[in-house]
Amino acid sequence: MDRIEWGSLPPTLHDAVQDHIGPVIKAEPSPEGRRSALAATVHTRAGQRLFLKGAPIDNARSVGDLDREAAIAPYVTAIAPELVCDVTAAGWRLLAFDYVEGRRANYAPGSPDLPAVVEAVTALDTLSCPDEVPLKWFDARWSTYAADPRQLAVLAGTAVLHTDLNPGNLLVGPQTVTVVDWAMASRGAAFVNPADLVLNLIACGHAPAEAEAVVHEVAAWRDAEPEAVDHYARTVAVAWLQAFWSYTHPWARAVVRAAQHWALYRMAR
C-alpha cells in the first residue's frame, strides 16, 4: 500500500485528531504497519507519544482492518496498547494508540527474547471478548485453501486469535512483551496462536522440530490433537503459496518457504 506522512494529510483531519490528543509537534513515519496508508509515531505538545495508523475510507479492506482493531482494543489491553481515539474525518479513518516503548522481537534460534515471547503468546489464551465484536472466523478465512473439510473443522472455535505474530508485532520492552497490530484478529481454535508463532519461528531460522519445541509448554499447543496441527500446517502452506507467491517482500518469501518446510515436516512424521 502507498504510504502517506502525517504532514500530507488534510488539515481538517489534523484538527479532528488534535481535538483528542492535543497539538502534534513532530511526526515520524513507522516502518511497521504495512497494511496501513499511514503509520507514524507522533509527539504532542504535552509530551505524549502516540502511534497513529489510518487509511482512506474508500479503501474497504483497510477500513475493515481498522474496524476490527478498534473493536477488539478494549478487550486486549492486558497485552496490547490502549486505543486513545478513533477518528473519521476528511475522507480518512484514523486510530491513535498509546506508544509502546520497545523493539521488535528477535525470533532467531537461541534468542534471549524467546521465553518472554512465549509468555506473551500464552497470555493470548486468557483473552475473551463479547460475541458482538466483529472478528473474522478463522476457519472461514482459510476456507479457500483447505482441500479437505476436516482441515476447516479443526480451525473452528471461539478463542481470540491474533493471527499475525511476526516479530514486528511483538515489541520487547524493559518489563514485558506487548502484542500490537490486531487488524487480523479472529475467532478460532486456541492452538492457532502458538501454531502461528511456530510458523514465524521457522521463517526466522528455526528447524520445524525446534520451533515446535519452543511452544511445547503452551497449554493451547499441548492440548491440540496432532492431526489438527497437521491440517493447520497443510492449509497455511497452500494459502501462503497461492496468495503470496508473487510478493517480493523478503518476509513474505521467508514465510512462504517456512510454511512449505513445516507442512513437509508434519507430513513425514
Give the label of every model feature segment.
Residues D196-R269:
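Helix-rich C-terminal or lid/interface subdomains of diverse kinases
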Residues D164, N169, D181:
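Conserved catalytic-loop position in the HRD/HxD motif
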Residues R35, Q48-G91, L95-D98, R103-L124:
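A conserved alpha-helical element in kinase catalytic cores
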Residues G173-A213:
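Active-site Asp-x-Gly
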Residues I57, G102, G168, V177, ...:
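Activation segment
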Residues L9-H20, A123-T163, G173-P174, T178:
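An alpha-helical support segment within catalytic cores of ATP-dependent transferases
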Residues T41-G47, Y99, G173:
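Active-site beta-strand termini and strand-to-loop segments that position acidic
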Residues V17-R45:
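ATP-binding glycine-rich phosphate-binding loop
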